């Protein structure tokens, strides 16, 4: 059955794309950032209501973690993630694959899937394409990611090739299982979408061939996975540029796990629509805050008596109400409020960076914006 997803390309400047992505939970203006709420909340004490207040469009939750705790069946009994978290916008759930390959211990990979030990208590779990789709059906997310093998970088070409082929076979099983779950009325969200994931490590030939194969499956969207895992930034950009011509023009494109503001600007420049990253919240929890002039460490002594907001150009609750000096004090005193305000600020910055990118694309001035800010925003000041 052909995909009914409505990604609409509104405008293009070179390879950069301005678009809309319509889902059952609302329309996403793209390019867009997905805010990582691993266990259904942003680390640092932010709720779904906070995400609404900072202008977020999409929330991303973690299939692996929610399967382990509180359990996807409990979430289904509570009406799905939207009712459980009180977030009514689009939610993307990852497949669990990345966590299985990065967190879990003693894993064993077969054609059927992966057997691994929980990082919480060590109990044995099996997850394959069907199990991942069943868990995500219980979660009821707007977008489910296909279950894929995440290969460590660097990797051998032969193993990477075999892994891509297995990921394609798993993708076909994901598609079939999602169709079954919908047909039998099992999915919490009968309009759940499926995204496939391009793999191939840093081998351009594997990346391109794999993208050609999965593009033929007519999925709702396509992601580039397995990057931003230690390879040089220039290599990541090159992989995006190599794959982009083979990504369907009428489908949304998602770069997984990326990244810094500069990374995002560069990837938009290369034709990517959708992003996610733990970086803004993780950095904020350590006092590293994004501004339009670069990155500041709010714990530095030079901010002890600084009466200015974190960023005078920012409209977030932290910048509207508090000084750098006060937020620095909260960090030094180890008050939870300091972390919460910092996380709120960085996520506001990321979401409004995307809004600024969309405005520049609308105006036809994105290339000039790219040239001005791509290095500046990642500079530590």
Regions found by a protein language model. Give the residues of each.
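Short acidic/polar active-site loop segments enriched in Thr and Asp
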Residues: 57, 142, 220, 273, ...
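A non-catalytic, amphipathic alpha-helix used as a structural packing/dimerization or gating element
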Residues: 131, 135, 162-173, 209, ...
